[in-house]
Structures are given as C-alpha cells and as structure tokens.
C-alpha cells in the first residue's frame, strides 16, 4: 500500500454498507479526508430498516472478501468478523425416496476449505466501528443524494430528520465538494443514475422470472441447538423451485424460497393447508419437521415476496471524479454467494490501480492537476479490468441457479466434480480445480476462472473421447482375432466389464 500522500484528497463515499465502508478504510489509510453519506440511519442501530425491507442476517463470506478486508491492515476487523462466523464445508441436499427422507452431503472443496456464514449486523458494526476510530473519516446518516455535477465535482444531498415525514420543513439540502466520489449505494444507485448524465454508459438490467421470500428455522425447542447440521448450506432442489437454509449464530437458520412468480401467485391464493402441502411435496422434511405449519403460513404472509435483479454496466467511472463499486456497478444474482465478495474485492483492485498510477505518490502527482490526471488513468484501467470480471461473475451466478436447482442431483455433475477433485488432490501440479473452488477459494480473476474451466472441460472431453476410442479399438481387435467365438454381447462384457 502507498504511504499517505502530502497532498490530501477529499473523497466522498455514497453508501455505508460493507463495500462503501471498506472503501472508506482504504482511502483513509492513504491519507484522504473521507466523508461517507448513507440514506438510512446508522446501520449499527437494530431498528434501521434494510433497503429491501427484510431482516435477513446471513451473508456468505469467502476468500475474496476475506482477502479484501485483510488488505485494509486492520487485523481486529477481520478477527471480529470471523469470530462468530459459521464455516459451511459443503452443501447438504435434501429429498425423499420411497417415502423416506434422505440427505446427502457434497463437500465444496477437496482440501476442506469452507464458506463462512456471517452475521450482517456483525459485519456492518465491525466496519463502522473501525471508521468511528479513524480520525480522517466523517460519517453522515439519513442523507439522500439528489444531484451531482461530475465536471465541477459537486454534489447535493437532502439531510432528513429521522422518524418524520419528508416535508420541506424536515428536509435540509446541502452542497458538498470533492476530489472524487465513490458510489457504493446498491443496485438502485443514485450515484450511477447521476453518473450516467455525464458518461456514455452501456447499461443492462434484468429481472429473472423468480421471486424470493425469507423463512426461519428456529433452534430446537428441546435442546436450543441447531435442528440440522450448521456446517452446510442446505438445499431442497427442484427443477423450478428451490429452498435453501443458512446457519445463524443464534442456532437458527435463515431460509429462502426461490420460485417463479406464477407459483407465488398460486400460493398467495391458497389456504394455509395448501401451502403446507406444497412444501411437503416440493421440500420434504421442512414442514412440519423444522418449521411449524403456523409459522410457515405466518412467514409466507408477512414477509415480502421480492424480485431478483442483476445488472451490468460499462464504464464504471467518469473522468477523474466518480467511480461506482459493488452492486451499484454489478448487482449479481445470489446463487454463487459472490455478491458481497465481488463488491469487497472491487476495493483492493481499485486502490491498487490508484497506487500503480501514482495517485498517492507526491513525486509523480505533486499538484492537484497531476493527481486528477493520474486518477483518471487509474479509473480507466480499473474499468477496463473490472468490467470483464464483474460481467463474468454475473453470468456464473445465473448458471449456478440452474445447478443448485437440479444440477446437484445430476450424475454428470457428480462425475465431473469427482474427476476434477481427484486430479486436484492427487496431481496438484496440474493446477486443476473445480469451478466452485476457483470462484470461492481463490482470488483468480472471474474472467480467468471461466477461461480455465473451459480449458479443463475441453481436456476432459478429449480424455473421455479417447477412452471411448480405445475401448472400441480393443473390441474391434477382439472381433477380428476371434470372430467365430465372440458375439457382440461378449465383446461388450469383455471391454466394459458389464453383464
């Protein structure tokens, strides 16, 4: 990391979630004066309502996110976050056959690495507490970005009084200036909206044909412990539906039902008993075993049924004055557990380009004009690299939805996973890894993950074809040597060892 520069910059960050907070730590460590503005109240207050109006407390934290936080050089931060994390070593697939419930574990990684289920409140609190102890950071809550001029580096915000209706009397408009602004304000980003007035942004937004609703599996009423294994991501797969459960620190599980909109409409018109029947048919063992019928109906009725959005855009910046990160630049579907991790990873990538181009080196950027020029080059380089990677994880997340719904039960999926893990474990010099391991347990660029997996797929295809050809050649040789003694059935049994 570069040493703090003598020429301090003023950095404004919009959004005080994990990505914006981490960006504030990185900028502050380089000597910048940081102001962070958040639409909501202080996220450390349990009464602050999340923007999606749910109280979901689970996040999946893997290698990329952990690395990004470690590189902030705040050891207490990562220790605090991981202290209460629950490691998930694999998936637990649930089903029913011949009237009997079954579950089957699938490890994530042949080397035993795990994804961490972390508490959203713990993560937010840890980051914001670090910022509170940082003298060159100021935090402003209940501030809404309403306008920005990225040519003159000015922005306008409404300061709102908590707990009051938005009226001219309760809202005060303020104007701020900055050297550059980081927009980390989510999928419906105001920063991106205002940046698009200045930059020619290619923008693609997509809602998939699925809604999600949150449920909760409580701790065991008898023991107070987890009702099912806490060290797995639990999946009840179906071709069109999926129910998943992630462990929480209070021994409960936060669950999500993913289903097409038409299925939600059907259930909304159904009776509570029909809801229970639907769950019993599609997700055997959930109700009444883990969630009571009354709780299931109550949670389905009271919790919102929300859409799933993904977006891509390019560029992620304009000039030297603004850059968008996290969901503001690349909201992804939740099916790879990489939304948080990709957003956190944006920050070290961004600041590595800032360092590389001398933004914080006074010998390279001795004046504000020189720093602005270096910053523009750094932001352009960031866009050039990060766009390819964020588009890649966007595509991978969509593909993983299909895998989680029914691919996890596919013999082809299981065979390829077994072959790749065997090569990874016994012949590590080949550098062979499953796609999941590359995404979740490495810092390899997402775009390079796709390229590597394609190469592995081609090699497996060639190897499989070669095996078939060798078998055919052996069979042909046997027929030519003893044509009168062997039938085709005998050859089949000889070559393939089958009856």
Curated annotation (Swiss-Prot):
Catalytic activity: L-kynurenine + NADPH + O2 + H(+) = 3-hydroxy-L-kynurenine + NADP(+) + H2O
GO molecular function: FAD binding; kynurenine 3-monooxygenase activity
InterPro entries: FAD-bd, FAD/NAD-bd_sf, Kynurenine_monooxygenase
Metabolic or biological pathway: Cofactor biosynthesis; NAD(+) biosynthesis; quinolinate from L-kynurenine: step 1/3
Cofactor requirement: FAD
Domain of life: Eukaryota
UniProt EC number: 1.14.13.9
Annotated keywords: FAD, Flavoprotein, Membrane, Mitochondrion, Mitochondrion outer membrane, Monooxygenase, NADP, Oxidoreductase, Pyridine nucleotide biosynthesis
Subcellular location: Mitochondrion outer membrane
Keyword NADP: yes
Family: Belongs to the aromatic-ring hydroxylase family. KMO subfamily.
Function: Catalyzes the hydroxylation of L-kynurenine (L-Kyn) to form 3-hydroxy-L-kynurenine (L-3OHKyn). Required for synthesis of quinolinic acid.
Name of the protein: Kynurenine 3-monooxygenase 3
Organism: Aspergillus niger (strain ATCC MYA-4892 / CBS 513.88 / FGSC A1513)
This protein's encoding gene: bna4-3
